[in-house]
Amino acid sequence: MNNAGNFFAGFFEELSPEQVRDQIETLLFGPMNVTRAVLPVMRKQRSGLVVTISSTAGITGQLFCTAYATAKFGIEGWMESLTPEIAPFGIRTMLVEPGFFRTELLTTDSTTYAQPTIDDYAKQTKEIVAAWKSMDGKQGGDPGKLANALVQLIALKEPPARFAAGADAVQVFEAKAEKLLARARAYDELSTSLAYEDA
């Protein structure tokens, strides 16, 4: 199970390139490296399940989460593309997108806030940091219940390719699906008029 976690929080302009790279290194390249190491064993035995913990931040972008969402969106694309590559060998994948769970993610050990350097962001930064710090230890999701749910899902003959973990995650999934459909329909005529005439 891939479950690396840290959080560089802040507005994009105030996050350093090094912080963004570190975020991607941990959240994306870390799981990639672990998976690359275990796939030969799974291919040899012609079975396996690669479980990767993503986030609702991999489904929809969020304020103050540019580095984190970049890495999580990367995980989503990587796993979606990896799935058909390894399916012929009996290997399945499962993405887990949790909402807010009462983990250590928002503690000072796991979250690094960007240094405020731009006045235009100062007020909002102060408000967001205060809100998130007050949320630490009060998140609604129970990690123990999530662990039990994952045990149930992993035991299934056909585990789901995606699992929205938490009521807030279900809401994020539904809102994103509705938004994508609305955007596709809004410019449907223009979108479908872009082919060559002889195509």
Describe every region a protein language model picked out.
Residues 3-8:
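Conserved NAD(P)H cofactor-binding loop of Rossmann-fold oxidoreductase domains
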Residues 11-12, 19-21:
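Substrate-binding pocket helix/loop in short-chain dehydrogenase/reductase
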Residues 13, 60-67:
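Active-site loop immediately N-terminal to the catalytic Tyr-X3-Lys motif
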Residues 35, 71:
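Active-site helix of classical SDR
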Residues 55:
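Residue(s) in the substrate-gating loop at a strand-loop-helix junction
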Residues 60, 81-92:
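Active-site-adjacent segment of SDR/Rossmann-fold oxidoreductases
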Residues 88-160:
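SDR active-site lid
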